[in-house]
């Protein structure tokens, strides 16, 4: 039996009991079969609030995997999910441009990063659930676009070589080779030559790779070892080098505790972990213990229902589900769970699914688990309670946000009249160039946007999406320096109001971001 102290879940940043803790709700999640956590994570991304390329492709991935699991386990296949999937495919098609590239949001330029990410999800989905006819044409167009981009890169590399300069494939070229190795299609002769050129360069890059690059290169080289037997040996060397950097802690599992990487459009901790797992499954499939230790860290990085971004959730699902179909319906005797000494009842279907999720109102101080099986198990405890929004302070990490609200007809800031317009000005300062940045301005409840239509606004260079309680701004590129974003609102009722925060963050690398404090707005007749 193992005991866990839960008291720290109810403390504030000063180490004292947080306000609202007495009215908390405690959720306990536990499974003898971590593969089921992947299935449980899928609904959270299967019906997204946003209609950008990543959210839509993640949803297509989630709904297709759900259908695949239902068929595998002879469960009911829901018609509603199939209709939702068809709609999401149609919406994603509208974000693909004539050249095959994908735009992040409608109206934006096509992006190599975005196209690579969408195509990678497509080939991984095909690897788990079989070739998908609904996305096949989109994938072909995306690969054509990426092939053209890569051909340009190869041409430039050869020019540099003629000048006796050292050249290496870019990270995007590495992703391209991965997509081709997963897809398996035969390319035109000139594109096959580009591929062979890049593979040869990649096999000789030993000192120039990041941990992620080595793990991804190991997978690519192993998949291409039929055309060159030496590639498999080199793949093994890369994987061995990667494993020398691993850190192991019993609770956390096996992971890579390297210094924070230079900025990239997405956080690479989870992709690195997934690539190492993928390389291990290909090159050392019998080393089950190491693979399970790597998967344990992936589970520990899970945030309540899902990982921190849809694309990381998709990555994690792939790492657990690829080749693990036989484990989906593996049964094991349930563990005995006690909260503050009281036995927690188990739902009837928990034995079948190997998964338990239960809630209990109020604070809790101790969780006890008596495990009855030898399988890897995983659990989590979440505490939810409300705190005054005024206690949330500002913060910044690479991106700074300042917000100013100016009533058009009042003399003093912070006061407004019913029926007048106010202007909210956001001043965003970036310490470097950032990709795919989302700004969310949670406004006071008395404000209604003058322009309530979503769309790309060329004047400020971003996609604007007004919602019921907040306005979202999406920049596919936020350059270094200061940026001004302005929105006008009508004041529609009197009273004293408190806004929410305004946040700016890299959507797929959320450790880079900033947040403002809240503001008060007094509205007179």
Residue spans for each PLM region:
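Extended, solvent-exposed functional surface patches
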Residues: 1-167, 173-184, 188-189, 264-265, ...
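Long, domain-scale non-catalytic interaction/scaffolding regions in large secretory-pathway
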Residues: 1-20, 160-166, 171-525
């Amino acid at each position: 039996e193992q005991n866990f102290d839960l008291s720290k879940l109810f403390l504030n940043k000063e180490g004292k009991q947080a306000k609202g803790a007495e009215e908390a709700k405690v959720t306990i999640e536990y499974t003898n079969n971590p593969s089921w956590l992947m299935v449980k994570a899928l609904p959270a991304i299967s019906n997204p609030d946003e209609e950008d390329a990543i959210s839509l492709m993640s949803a297509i991935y989630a709904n297709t995997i759900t259908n695949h699991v239902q068929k595998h386990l002879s469960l009911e296949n829901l018609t509603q999910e199939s209709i939702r999937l068809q709609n999401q495919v149609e919406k994603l098609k509208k974000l693909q441009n004539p050249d095959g590239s994908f735009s992040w949001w409608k109206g934006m330029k096509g992006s190599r990063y975005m196209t690579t990410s969408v195509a990678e999800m497509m080939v991984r989905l095909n690897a788990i659930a079989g070739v998908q006819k609904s996305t096949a044409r989109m994938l072909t167009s995306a690969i054509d676009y990426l092939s053209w981009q890569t051909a340009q890169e190869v041409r430039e590399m050869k020019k540099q070589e003629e000048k006796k300069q050292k050249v290496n494939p870019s990270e995007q070229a590495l992703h391209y080779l991965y997509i081709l190795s997963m897809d398996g299609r035969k390319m035109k002769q000139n594109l096959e030559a580009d591929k062979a050129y890049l593979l040869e360069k990649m096999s000789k890059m030993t000192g120039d790779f990041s941990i992620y690059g080595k793990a991804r290169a190991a997978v690519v080289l192993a998949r291409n070892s039929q055309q060159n037997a030496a590639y498999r040996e080199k793949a093994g060397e890369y994987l061995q080098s990667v494993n020398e950097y691993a850190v192991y802690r019993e609770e956390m599992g096996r992971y890579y505790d390297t210094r924070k990487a230079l900025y990239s459009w997405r956080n690479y901790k989870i992709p690195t972990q997934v690539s190492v797992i993928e390389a291990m499954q290909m090159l050392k499939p019998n080393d089950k213990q190491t693979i399970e230790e790597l998967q344990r860290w992936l589970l520990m990085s899970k945030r309540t229902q899902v990982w921190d971004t849809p694309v990381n959730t998709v990555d994690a699902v792939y790492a657990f589900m690829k080749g693990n179909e036989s484990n989906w319906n593996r049964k094991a005797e349930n563990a005995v769970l006690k909260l503050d000494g009281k036995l927690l009842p188990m739902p009837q279907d928990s034995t079948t699914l190997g998964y338990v999720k239960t809630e209990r109102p109020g604070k809790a101080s101790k969780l006890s688990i008596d495990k009855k099986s030898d399988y890897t198990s995983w659990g989590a405890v979440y505490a939810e309670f409300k705190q005054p929004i005024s206690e949330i302070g500002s913060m910044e990490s690479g991106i700074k946000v300042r917000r100013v609200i100016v009533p058009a007809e009042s003399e003093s800031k912070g006061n407004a009249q019913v029926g007048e317009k106010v202007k909210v000005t956001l001043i965003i300062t970036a310490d470097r160039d950032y990709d795919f940045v989302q700004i969310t301005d949670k406004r006071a409840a008395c404000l209604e946007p003058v322009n309530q239509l979503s769309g790309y606004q060329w004047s400020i260079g971003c996609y604007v999406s007004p919602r019921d309680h907040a306005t979202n701004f999406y920049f596919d590129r936020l350059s270094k320096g200061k940026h001004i974003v302005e929105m006008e609102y009508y004041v529609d009722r009197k009273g004293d109001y408190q806004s929410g925060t305004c946040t700016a963050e890299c959507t797929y690398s959320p450790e880079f971001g900033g947040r403002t404090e809240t503001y008060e707005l007094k509205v007179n007749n």
